[in-house]
């Protein structure tokens, strides 16, 4: 940052900032690039904006959140109100229980590689304000300072910027909606077929139970009860449905920031097809 704090910002400075925004003379400063360690041992670049830029970005973030938050998919959990990695894990725990295959995705270098033209095109689908877009272009092209050297930005939105998370969600909302539509096309069957072996044990238990009701002899009743218990014990170790039923397919999807996971009820070839399509 520029070493200044919002607490120390005077009313006059804020008024000057508003005037600069009104006459479009406002020019964001290059972000200060720093690095923080990642879990895998690599370093993650952060772009720290100036105090003035933080303030303006926060206003833009509030505007974008008011426009887009209500239309984001329920499968998106990163950088959203009342959502977190914990809500993402809860959704996985709740919806992925029957999944047999998993596809994990991590969009490498996502924040640094967001296509500016594509991003602006997505924003223009909902926003019609030329002044807004002129300001947005200024932020996207502001560049960054690293080791006292200025670097231009041709793509991406810097991690560390207040506006970057919601821009990322707006960008990746296209993926979320694609996966929602993909699931509608992929899913097949109302329910899985019953496991034939499970069904056979159930029929035996029913038949023995019927016979038990009709039997008075104590020794015979004991034999029937023991047989029923044994069949119930054997059935407990079996799934009630056919887990390899080709007539039943489902796909589940959850995203947190630029990481996503897909759970698949289907075949290995189904998974390979999904990877190709994505």
Provide a role label for each language-model segment:
Residues 1-278:
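Non-catalytic terminal/accessory segments
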């Amino acid at each position: 940052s520029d070493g200044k704090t919002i607490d120390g910002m005077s009313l006059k400075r804020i008024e000057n900032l508003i005037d600069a925004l009104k006459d479009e003379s406002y020019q964001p400063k290059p972000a200060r690039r720093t690095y923080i360690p990642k879990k895998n041992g690599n370093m993650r670049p952060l772009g720290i904006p100036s105090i003035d830029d933080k303030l303006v970005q926060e206003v833009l973030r509030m505007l974008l959140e008011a426009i887009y938050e209500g239309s984001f998919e329920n499968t998106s959990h990163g950088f959203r109100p009342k959502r977190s990695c914990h809500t993402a894990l809860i959704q996985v725990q709740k919806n992925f229980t029957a999944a047999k295959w998993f596809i994990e995705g991590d969009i490498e270098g996502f924040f640094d590689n967001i296509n500016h033209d594509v991003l602006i095109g997505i924003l223009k689908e909902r926003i019609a304000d030329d002044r807004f877009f002129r300001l947005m272009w200024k932020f996207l092209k502001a560049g960054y300072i690293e080791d006292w050297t200025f670097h231009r930005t041709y793509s991406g939105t810097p991690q560390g910027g207040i506006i970057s998370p919601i821009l990322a969600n707006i960008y990746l909302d296209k993926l979320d909606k694609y996966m929602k539509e993909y699931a509608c096309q992929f899913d097949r069957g109302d329910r899985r077929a019953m496991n034939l072996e499970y069904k056979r044990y159930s029929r035996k238990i029913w038949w023995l139970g019927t016979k038990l009701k009709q039997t008075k002899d104590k020794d015979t009743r004991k034999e029937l009860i023991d047989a029923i218990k044994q069949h119930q014990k054997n059935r407990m170790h079996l799934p009630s449905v056919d887990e390899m039923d080709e007539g039943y397919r489902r796909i589940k999807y959850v995203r947190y920031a630029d990481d996503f996971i897909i759970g698949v009820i289907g075949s290995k070839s189904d998974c390979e097809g999904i990877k190709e399509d994505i």
